[in-house]
């Protein structure tokens, strides 16, 4: 009986009722929690295995110096995800649907193809990260880890048929576990407070490679597929009755984004600071792979718990981000070309590149780098339309961006695109 009562309180209809009562000025106890969830799902993409690789290398090579980059990237992510939620709420459509309605059909098909490629490349990194975690923690082969990852993520995706709230609870539990794990890692590593605060608050680049890593941190933080996804998730809570309700709902969504991105930011800051305290401080400046980090943590920190917690955090981050990647792929296909395929089929298709990488014996580190390069191509295609649409009063109505928000968004968008062009140029030229 208690189980049935609990399930009723977390059902989609119950969440919608709680949200409606709060927006109508008749909040129930804890009814404000009904608005929290979409940004937690989006936040998972900001702590995927690609972030592990860039944060660890930045911390081991430059200590705390690039902490400010992580903080700045997180603030940019807050703005971008807020705009995505705002677009979905104002239009009742996700970003791909708005693009489909307003762009020429040939261009829409090009958008769809690049978005699918970026989503698959992103899922490659997430999938390999989870498979690598199974290998490090339990001694499984990468192929066994990959097959286990595919099975677990498929079973988790099966929950979505029972409603969005169960999925939000599952993903939320995973991201909170990852955050708890890295807070523990930070405590075990005993960082120096003064250099940590200096790196967090004082911008600077020690050399040219630091700029390259900073661009990599930003590229691993801003994820096109969750920009598409978040605009879809913001429509699920409640059908708003009028403009006043819509504005009130947007305030809650803004808080949701702040909470979700703050958790993701805490994870990334803890990750880089841990690498700085454990590796840079002991002269290990060349730790650049996830495997090296796992193997060196226990000997340096002096506790085997450190390695196990790191491996478990990697596993949960890989699994949860792979789940979110599959959901994003559904939104991308449905939005751009108005076609849906079963989740199991999408899960199978997006597994194939990871399985091919493992069978061909390609280094997981090289695959992660390649996935980040492909990701860099897709960022402008999501950011530019998002900024243009949310600044258009005909599309957004009373949720249109203020001029100041559009101005800041333009600066952020230009900076992100420029840094990603720099990463691509540096990668292909070898500089």
From Swiss-Prot:
One of its GO terms (cellular component) is plasma membrane. GO terms for molecular function: cadmium ion transmembrane transporter activity; manganese ion transmembrane transporter activity; metal ion binding; symporter activity. Its main location: membrane. InterPro entries: NRAMP_fam. One of its GO terms (biological process) is iron ion transmembrane transport. It is found in: Cell inner membrane. It is a multi-pass membrane protein. HAMAP family: NRAMP. H(+)-stimulated, divalent metal cation uptake system. PANTHER family: NATURAL RESISTANCE-ASSOCIATED MACROPHAGE PROTEIN 2, SOLUTE CARRIER PROTEIN FAMILY 11 MEMBER. NCBIfam families: nramp, Nramp_1, PRK00701.1. This is Divalent metal cation transporter MntH. It comes from Chromohalobacter salexigens (strain ATCC BAA-138 / DSM 3043 / CIP 106854 / NCIMB 13768 / 1H11). The lineage of its organism: Bacteria, Pseudomonadati, Pseudomonadota, Gammaproteobacteria, Oceanospirillales.
């Amino acid at each position: 009986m208690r189980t049935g009562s609990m399930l009723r309180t977390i059902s989609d209809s119950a969440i919608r009722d709680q949200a409606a009562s709060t927006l109508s000025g008749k909040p129930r106890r804890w009814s404000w929690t009904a608005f929290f969830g979409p940004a937690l799902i989006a936040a998972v993409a900001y702590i995927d295995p690609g972030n592990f690789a860039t944060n660890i290398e930045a911390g081991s090579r430059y200590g705390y110096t690039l902490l400010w980059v992580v903080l700045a990237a997180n603030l940019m992510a807050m703005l971008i995800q807020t705009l995505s939620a705002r677009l979905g709420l104002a239009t009742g459509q996700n970003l791909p649907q708005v693009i489909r309605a307003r762009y020429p059909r040939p261009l829409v098909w090009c958008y769809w193809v690049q978005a699918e490629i970026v989503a698959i490349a992103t899922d490659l990194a997430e999938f390999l990260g989870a498979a690598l975690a199974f290998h490090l923690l339990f001694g499984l082969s990468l192929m066994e880890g990959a097959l286990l990852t595919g099975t677990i993520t498929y079973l988790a995706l099966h929950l979505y048929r029972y409603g969005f709230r169960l999925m939000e609870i599952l993903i939320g539990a995973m991201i909170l576990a990852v955050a708890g794990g890295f807070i523990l890692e930070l405590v075990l590593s005993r960082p120096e407070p003064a250099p940590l605060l200096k790196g967090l608050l004082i911008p600077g680049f020690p050399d040219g490679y630091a700029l390259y890593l900073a661009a990599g941190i930003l590229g691993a933080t801003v994820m096109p597929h969750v920009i598409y996804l978040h605009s879809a998730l913001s429509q699920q809570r409640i059908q708003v009755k009028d403009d006043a309700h819509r504005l009130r709902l947007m305030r809650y969504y803004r808080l949701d984004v702040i909470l979700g991105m703050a958790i993701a930011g805490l994870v990334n800051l803890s990750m880089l600071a841990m690498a700085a305290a454990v590796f840079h401080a002991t002269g290990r400046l060349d730790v650049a792979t996830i495997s090296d980090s796992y193997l060196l943590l226990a000997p340096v920190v002096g506790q085997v718990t450190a390695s196990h917690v790191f491996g478990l955090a990697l596993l949960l981050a890989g699994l949860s981000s792979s789940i979110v990647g599959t959901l994003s792929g559904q939104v991308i296909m449905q939005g751009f070309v108005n076609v849906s395929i079963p989740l199991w089929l999408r899960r199978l298709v997006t597994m194939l590149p990871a399985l091919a990488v493992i069978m061909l014996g390609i280094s997981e580190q090289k695959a992660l780098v390649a996935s980040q390069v492909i990701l860099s191509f897709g960022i402008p295609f999501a950011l530019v339309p998002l900024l243009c649409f949310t600044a258009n009063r005909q599309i957004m109505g009373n949720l249109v961006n203020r001029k100041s928000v559009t101005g800041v968004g333009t600066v952020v968008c230009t900076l992100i695109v420029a840094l990603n062009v720099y990463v691509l140029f540096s990668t292909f030229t070898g500089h």
